């Protein structure tokens, strides 16, 4: 569950290291975002000579959340940290690699490029 002002780790090699959520997309009254949702973020930490700079406003797809997400079979998935992948306007990742596992829920929301780049899908 991600809301405004939530700090997220970045799970790709776009150059950003920390993001701060500034808007949850999907309606003016929407308060929370979950796995596979797109949010608008501000880059709080970035590597030098990277594609995204500190202070840039970017879109990101949430790939891991600390809040458990129930699944249809009765199980639930949760991760240690909140993480996101920086994407462009078309929803394609800016980076060329993804670090760490991603949730299976991304496949249902048609983020096939992110799922295929991930080393593990849980």
Swiss-Prot record:
Stated name of the protein: Large ribosomal subunit protein uL14
Annotated SMART domains: Ribosomal_L14
Signal peptide segment: none
HAMAP family per record: Ribosomal_uL14 (MF_01367)
Transmembrane spans: none
Cysteines joined through disulfide linkages: none
Family under the similarity heading: Belongs to the universal ribosomal protein uL14 family.
GO MF: large ribosomal subunit rRNA binding; structural constituent of ribosome
RNA-binding listed as a keyword: yes
Gene: rplN
């Amino acid at each position: 569950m991600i809301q405004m002002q939530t700090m997220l780790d970045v799970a790709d090699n776009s150059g950003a290291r920390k993001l701060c959520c500034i808007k949850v997309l999907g309606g003016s009254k929407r308060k929370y975002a979950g796995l596979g949702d797109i949010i608008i973020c501000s880059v709080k930490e970035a590597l030098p000579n990277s594609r995204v700079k500190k202070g840039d406003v970017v879109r990101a797809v949430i790939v891991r959340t600390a809040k458990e997400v129930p699944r249809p079979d009765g199980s639930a998935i949760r991760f240690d940290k909140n993480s996101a992948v920086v994407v462009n306007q078309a929803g394609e990742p800016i980076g060329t690699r993804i670090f760490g596992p991603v949730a299976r829920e991304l496949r249902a929301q048609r983020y096939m490029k992110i799922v295929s780049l991930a080393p593990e899908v849980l």
